[in-house]
Amino acid sequence: MIINEELQNVRLSQILKDALIKATDTYSTPPQIIWIDNSTIATLGNFSASTGKAKAKKTFNVSALVAASLANGQVLNYHASLPEGKRRILYVDTEQSRYHCHNVLERILKLAGLSTATDNENLDFICLREYTPAVRIEVIDYALSHNEGYGLVIIDGIRDLLLDINNAAESVEVINKMMEWSSKYNIHIHCVLHLNKGDNNVRGHIGTEMNNKAETVLVISKNSNTPNISEVKALHIREKEFKPFAFTVNEQGLPELATDYDSSEDEHGKSAPLKYTDLTIE
């Protein structure tokens, strides 16, 4: 019993030592890695999210964000620059079949202007559909601890890291994992969330946590006048807000900018502003 108490004291003493911030400490500004126009939406050591209702084309949007990061260039309005030594990307899909995951992988490579005939050493795409939430978390943790060079991690969708999406404690634990991984491995994590349809089911817990902790939350929604157009706006952003943009999916199944889109044209049909309590995990 005494030995256990001593071990606990050593553990807590080490945590306290590691957590202490001194006036004499120096910290560099977190590297910015992804922008929309001139607004920073992602830095290393933080996490962000994109959200939207079903069929809003959230995964198409994430594909563009990943492609820009893979190419260290621009796709849609996303511009990315991952530093040397942080060029690798881990994409975790928890809900789609291997066939549909492969489609997303090919889409990312095409958007990045890369060959689909060879594997890219900077993109690891894993499908964890058939595993339990606990195993999924273990696998992600193992991948991060045993592979060097990751700068960006995508988790699509994060709801599958929980057993009960109504459980406040589980929601806090998952968000804490995002903060732990992003800080420990100096990476940026982007999660995909689902937007409530307007009822009172599964509301509040994850929304509150995202409000307090996420660097950026993007909203992807269908244009009320032109349903085949998906709009991208900021629900929450620590940086200055960017001008909303929109995209469509072309005949090749790739997202492209909607050139004739006017962000002001949808004002008359706009619903009440979104709140974090309208979010649930996906």
Predicted regions and their residues:
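The Walker A/P-loop phosphate-binding site
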Residues: 4-108
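Conserved catalytic network of the ASCE P-loop NTPase/AAA+ motor domain
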Residues: 42, 81-85, 115-118, 145-147, ...
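Amphipathic alpha-helical transducer elements in NTP-driven molecular machines
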Residues: 44, 98, 102, 133-137, ...
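Phosphate-binding/switch region of NTP-binding enzymes
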Residues: 49-51, 55, 60, 169-261
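Alpha-helical scaffold elements adjacent to nucleotide-binding pockets in ATP/GTP-utilizing enzyme cores
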Residues: 64-65, 100-108, 139, 143, ...
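Conserved, well-folded catalytic cores of nucleic-acid-processing
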Residues: 68-73, 108-111, 161-164, 181, ...
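Conserved inter-motif catalytic segment of the P-loop NTP-binding fold
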Residues: 83-166, 253, 261-266
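DNA transaction DNA-binding modules
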Residues: 256-282
